Amino acid sequence: DLRMSRGLGDVYKRQIITILCVISIIICNRRIKKNASQKLYTEITETPKNNVGLLLGTSPKLKNGNNNLYFDYRIFATLELYKAGKINYILISGDNRKENYNEPEEMKKALMQRGVPEKYIYLDYAGFRTLDSVVRAKEVFGQSRLTIISQRFHNERAIYLAEKNGINAIGYNAKDVNAYSGLKTNIRELFARVKMFIDLAINKQPHFLGDKIIIGK
């Protein structure tokens, strides 16, 4: 029966596509993790010093109004680095596409409330994606060495992006959330890793670049 043959053909096609997607996810994930394995730090005493820490943005609140632990833990990690003298300046890069949504300003406010002087904080309002944040750190803010501050899964991908864009980067891992709370984020991250390789293959550029800003001047 012709219709049955076509139906079976469609099933096989979907199965092959699914298998290829799974293989792609596994390969991309392993490659990113292996690349970052010697460049990630969780102990402040072992972390090398860099002039600038790149703090990757996120919202202070979840959609349900609860505190976003990813935000809180990244702030704590940044404070650890700053107070230990492991970074001199903090570049906060995040999303400010909407008038009432401003990741960099919220993070700046949280850091200043905990004692970081404003003169040591720089803001990048066009960090819409990790790619934008990393590339702009070099092209706009002139950084060729960075300590990237986020959770481990995010740092791994950011380090890979940084190296592909000529930046010598390490990552300082903020505390992660528990597996249940972070399940959706962790699943999304797997697909983000595949997309990162596609972006690199097509030489994807940030949404915006703009005038140069000198950190520490």
Please place each PLM-identified region on the residue numbering.
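A general structural signal for short secondary-structure boundary/capping elements
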Residues: 97-102, 170, 192-199, 215-217
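A structural signal for short, hydrophobic/glycine-enriched beta-strand patches
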Residues: 28-187
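A transmembrane-helix-recognition feature enriched in membrane-embedded lipid enzymes
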Residues: 183-205
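Single conserved hydrophobic/aromatic residue that forms the stacking wall/gate
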Residues: 1-12
